[in-house]
Amino acid sequence: MAYADLKNCKIITAFITPFHEDGSINFEAIPDLIEHLLAHHTDGILLAGTTAESPTLTHDEELELFAAVQKVVKGRVPLIAGVGTNETRDSIEFVKEVDEFGGFAAGLAIVPYYNKPSQEGMYQHFKAIADASNLPIIIYNIPGRVVVEMTPETMLRLAEHPNIIGVKECTSLANMAYLIEHRPEEFLIYTGEDGDAFHAMNLGADGVISVASHTNGDEMFEMLDAIEHNDIKKAAAIQRKFIPKVNALFSYPSPAPVKAVLNYLGFAAGPTRLPLVPAPEEDAKRIIKVVVDGDYQATKETVKGVLRPDY
């Protein structure tokens, strides 16, 4: 059922966590943010991922966040819960808790960070999580954050597990092409790189788990819709204008830029939690001009070339 729920999700938004100035979660801001996303082509929502600043959230806070979002969404789109840590036992305990909590199509588990496990260690980590829970698991492969990279061969070994249903892939397009070519049936492949969505979808990926969909969901939808209708020329034209906006959204450690834009648009995204800090005021103004207005003079002042940042 989880595969069927997610198969038609082209744009899954990696939801921010709105905070008050004192650092507490701003639950009152969640309804407006969710309705904004759903009005602008979000097909699914990931909670407690990187963009949510999950390393700064306690498990209790994550469960409170889950309850608040479920109350607003009311089953209109599938939800994915961030469940993974760099400690296998903790990941198993939390994925069981989230499974019992209910209301999620899948759990997203990150490749363990800091520990620097081998490929066999990664395999055993995800196998243990998937064995322990009924909640389907999506692997999150993001070497820029965790230092180690799961190889396509290890990924395909794990793809044979009946409870591992997909991957959020943030490596190379070459790796993505290999995975798409060799994946088993009913294994979902999402890019986690907004700037790669055009290429990934043309290669045959299932969708994108996105930060930019908070602010530019309509553009992303138009691009993916053009690809689906084989209008590559139109999709490429949208992509060329979209890339500078993505670059601006990642010109400071995420989610600081997207929160700056959302705050400007009138959504109470609030600040980031330490150790992340907001983008400096003048840079935030330029980011807003790029993302909201497509101001390419601001683009030149904000980012140089195509960014592939580690954040």
From Swiss-Prot:
Query: Which top EC class applies here?
Result: lyase
Q: Which gene encodes it?
A: dapA
Specify whether Transcription is a keyword of the entry: no
The primary location reported for this protein is cytoplasm
Under Gene3D superfamilies, the record lists: Aldolase class I
* Lineage of source species: Bacteria, Bacillati, Bacillota, Bacilli, Lactobacillales
The protein's name is: 4-hydroxy-tetrahydrodipicolinate synthase
Its EC number(s): 4.3.3.7
- Name the residues annotated as site: Part of a proton relay during catalysis: T50, Y114
Q: Which residues form the active site?
A: Y140, K168
Q: Subunit info? A: Homotetramer; dimer of dimers.
Residues annotated to bind pyruvate: T51, I209
Subcellular localization, as worded in the UniProt entry: Cytoplasm
Q: Where is the signal peptide?
A: none
Pathway involvement? Amino-acid biosynthesis; L-lysine biosynthesis via DAP pathway; (S)-tetrahydrodipicolinate from L-aspartate: step 3/4
Q: Name one Pfam family in it.
A: DHDPS
Q: Which organism is it from?
A: Streptococcus sanguinis (strain SK36)
**SUPFAM superfamilies per UniProt:** Aldolase
**Catalysed reaction, written as an equation:** L-aspartate 4-semialdehyde + pyruvate = (2S,4S)-4-hydroxy-2,3,4,5-tetrahydrodipicolinate + H2O + H(+)
